[in-house]
Amino acid sequence: MEYNRFSNDKLGHEELIKLIKEQEIKIIVCEPTGGYESEICQELYNNKQQIHKVNTYSFNSFSQSMNLCKTDKKDAFKLAYYGDKMQLTANYLYQVESETLKRYQQRREDLVLMLSNEKKRLHHSIDGIDKESIEKLIKFLQNEIAELDKKLNEVIDESEELKEKVKILESVPGIGKCVGKKLISFLPELGNKNYSSNELSAIVGIAPYARDSGNKQGRRFIRGGRKIPRDALYMEVLAGKNGVKNGFQYLKALYDRLVNNYKPKKVAVVACMRKLLEVCHKLIQQKRCFVI
């Protein structure tokens, strides 16, 4: 197997694309590397190349089963072998609006976390020595968040598809503007007919995995997934199960039924999260708003 190494810059990207076209490679298998792969994936997609971004958990399990040492060359071989044996198909889709929305929303999440930390520091500022500095930073962060909100709204207003998604999501009880933007930013698969509700639950990390063997039935568990949309759904369900928000009767009924059947309360909460996600997914697919 031939091994080549390219720099992660414009020149390296051009060399890689040239080699791919010369060898008529059908699909490129890529491992997520914390965003370092984003630029080359975009360029490959713009050059009409088929790209598959592997699931890190699945690939790591496959990689460990091969019992090979850890080098760049071996890692490249593992990716190629994994793609061949698993018969992977393209799953990478680049859309300018979705990517822009995701970056703005991610930056907003970072600033909100910083703002929360600064408010805690202000609360514990006993003698007020650092109070003025903290208050200045809090005001700056609030202005930056407001500016990002404007940019997020501009991106959504420029796309009819995103506007429709946000409108449908906001019609669902408990899904306000903030949560709706989080879902469409970090879960672009939402409403896509190529994804079932179970697959979407697995992507978010709220799908139950069995652990059975013979006559033994182990406890189901959840793992992995995208943290920001999962956290957003969790907070909405916590409010809904207590009847805090109007229109949440269907979730409260599900929660009460599971708890009355002696299911652990956290199991009932996760089940409600899946139900809420399924409702959002189906409504966007059918292009209709929630009706109480």
Predicted regions located by residue number:
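Short glycine-rich phosphate-binding loop at a beta-alpha junction
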Residues: 25-36
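Helix-hairpin-helix
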Residues: 165-188, 200
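Phosphate-backbone recognition surface of nucleic-acid-processing proteins
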Residues: 11, 183-261, 265
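Acidic, carboxylate-rich catalytic segments that either coordinate divalent cations
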Residues: 246-292
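Short alpha-helical scaffolding segments that buttress acidic/His motifs in well-ordered protein cores
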Residues: 101, 169, 183, 232-237, ...
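Long, charge-rich intrinsically disordered scaffolds of nucleic-acid metabolism proteins
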Residues: 45, 52-168, 172
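Nucleic-acid-processing active sites and adjacent nucleic-acid-binding tracks
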Residues: 1-27
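Short Gly/Thr/Asp-enriched flexible loops that form oxyanion-binding sites at enzyme active sites
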Residues: 38-45
